[in-house]
Amino acid sequence: MAGIEPMLAVNLGTRDGDAARNMLEYCNFPGGTAWSDLRRKHGWEKPHGVKFWCLGNEMDGPWQMESKTADEYGRRAYEAAKMMRWIDPSIELAACGSSARSMATYGQWEQTVLEHTFDQVEYISLHTYLNNYAGDTAAFLACPDLMDTFIEEVVAIADSVAAKRRSSKRIMLSFDEWNVWYRTRRDRATRVKEGWPVAPPILEEIYTMEDALAFGGACISLLNHADRVKTACLAQLVNVIAPIMTEKGGAAWRQTIFWPFAQMSRFGRGHALRAKVDSPTYDATYYDPRGKQDNYYPIAAAPYLKLSAIADRATKGLNLMMLNRHLTEPLSVEVMARGFSGKSVVAAMTLHDKDLQAVNSAAAPDRVAPRKLGRISLDGERIKLTLPPASWSVVSLA
């Protein structure tokens, strides 16, 4: 009904390739075997046909049960993948990349894992959670540029493994965990103190206007690397670090980050263009405490304008997603869209609030919501507009 496909992960920590094979057999094999017949007994005559499988999750993380070294994981993932393909050769598999770019083994982990699994996987995973522990808004809005770096580094590593094999195969990227998340990470706020309550509130991050801007920057980073990032999963969707909040027996409302996500989904369809951006820049230092020590990442020459351009060849339309990272000044934008002949503005919206700590709530669900963007000038291939300070904006032209 929702028009989606599942992505399932097998357990390669406390379990192994045999358990992975059995799970796939249960899901995808037509019948006549122990596990497929068990599925049929459970009421599902036809196979589920799950095509996308993750070979474990964050296996480099010491918080995982039976975390692995890169060699340990790589060997186990290779054997699991081999056995799974014997059951269903049509599946697509993702190997675990580093749990974060700040992990001590980052880089070497990807290299070693892919040297083991290259012939058996289509993807390697990436995870990122943006934060503003330092209370530095400018750095927070610049940190999606580190996502760009992360993606480009992993692509380079994957392609180096291919080059060593003299292979034309290209490993794609599965950015299967990403979001803004930091307030509820440290407080372990909802740990069960006594008993086993049903559905207690857990990790209910309340998102601000500021968060929506950083989130929008992450959306742009993903779109601008659509040639290699072939799947990207927001973690999570409802209540737990989520764009949608609910109350038991009560209201449901959209958090601030809902809007960039919804607009990326609606307008980010077509062909991602390689836009050349000429913008004033600023320098920042991003703080990320992930790992055993504090990590400070310099971000040099972050452009105030972060932009993604999407062409819809069917309608000959052009969609622009733009982030103005200047905290106090509007940004005049001129786009030269070579070959574009559109004459009308289909949609023009901006997400902006003078209070960057503004939030949505059950009492005020539309406190932060898209508003109409100001006048847009269309003159042939030249498009002119002005972005409010600290804003996320979407323009659709046809």
Language model: regions and residue ranges:
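C-terminal beta-sandwich/jelly-roll accessory domains of carbohydrate-active enzymes
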Residues: 280, 285-302, 315, 323-398
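N-terminal catalytic cores of secreted or lumenal carbohydrate-active enzymes
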Residues: 1-131, 135, 152, 159
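Aromatic/acidic polysaccharide-binding cleft in carbohydrate-active enzymes
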Residues: 168, 173-305
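Extended catalytic-interface subdomain
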Residues: 122-131, 136, 140-161, 167-185, ...
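Conserved, mostly hydrophobic/aromatic
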Residues: 23, 53, 93, 124, ...
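Short, surface-exposed beta-strand/loop micro-motifs that present aromatic residues
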Residues: 303-313
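Flexible loop/turn segments at secondary-structure boundaries
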Residues: 14-18, 60-63, 100-105, 130-136, ...
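A structural motif corresponding to the C-terminal end of an alpha-helix
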Residues: 1-5, 83-90, 120, 154-170, ...
